[in-house]
């Protein structure tokens, strides 16, 4: 073992703004996993999912549903974050979110994307509708075991 060479360990040094962002994301995880949030979102989706269809054309009603969703869900999250972080600013966090989007965990980023990306919002409703109607992707029938032994093949 050579003692002349020092091992160089990369240590991630985060700025206060990174630490603040990470704290907000941690709180967000707690909020969206909470039963109250799940209930609010599920109730909203249950109320509106039948309006959505998989056509290329977006109906005018989608806009009002989207705006209602943003108002309801974003307001709920912002209130919960303000309880945990006095002086929290959702607008500043949204801008910070764009800078950190490559670092975000998938589910949280996808959910937050539904506030700003209409197509993500519509896709969420289409997935929910497919699930409600039993059209969700079922991979359980994807694996079939077939014997390669000729003697197990019955003759017709």
Swiss-Prot record:
Signal peptide: none annotated. GO terms for biological process: maintenance of protein location in nucleus; positive regulation of tyrosine phosphorylation of STAT protein. Keywords: Cell projection, Cilium, Cytoplasm, Cytoskeleton, Mitochondrion, Nucleus. The keyword Translocase does not apply. The keyword tRNA processing does not apply. One of its GO terms (molecular function) is transcription coactivator activity. It is found in: Cytoplasm; Mitochondrion intermembrane space; Cytoplasm, Cytoskeleton, Microtubule organizing center, Centrosome; Nucleus. It comes from the Eukaryota. Belongs to the ARL2BP family. This is ADP-ribosylation factor-like protein 2-binding protein. It comes from Gallus gallus (Chicken). The gene is ARL2BP.
């Amino acid at each position: 073992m050579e003692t002349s060479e020092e091992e160089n360990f990369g240590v991630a040094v985060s700025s206060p703004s990174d630490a603040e962002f990470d704290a907000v994301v941690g709180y967000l995880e707690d909020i969206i996993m909470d039963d109250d949030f799940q209930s609010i979102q599920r109730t909203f989706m249950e109320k509106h999912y039948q309006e959505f269809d998989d056509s290329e054309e977006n109906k005018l009603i989608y806009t009002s549903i989207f705006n209602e969703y943003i108002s309801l869900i974003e307001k709920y999250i912002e209130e919960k974050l303000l309880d945990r972080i006095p002086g929290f600013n959702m607008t500043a966090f949204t801008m910070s979110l764009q800078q950190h989007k490559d670092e975000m965990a998938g589910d949280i980023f996808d959910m937050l994307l539904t506030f700003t990306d209409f197509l993500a919002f519509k896709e969420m409703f289409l997935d929910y509708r497919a699930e409600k109607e039993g059209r969700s992707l079922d991979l359980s029938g994807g694996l079939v075991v077939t014997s390669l032994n000729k003697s197990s093949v019955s003759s017709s």
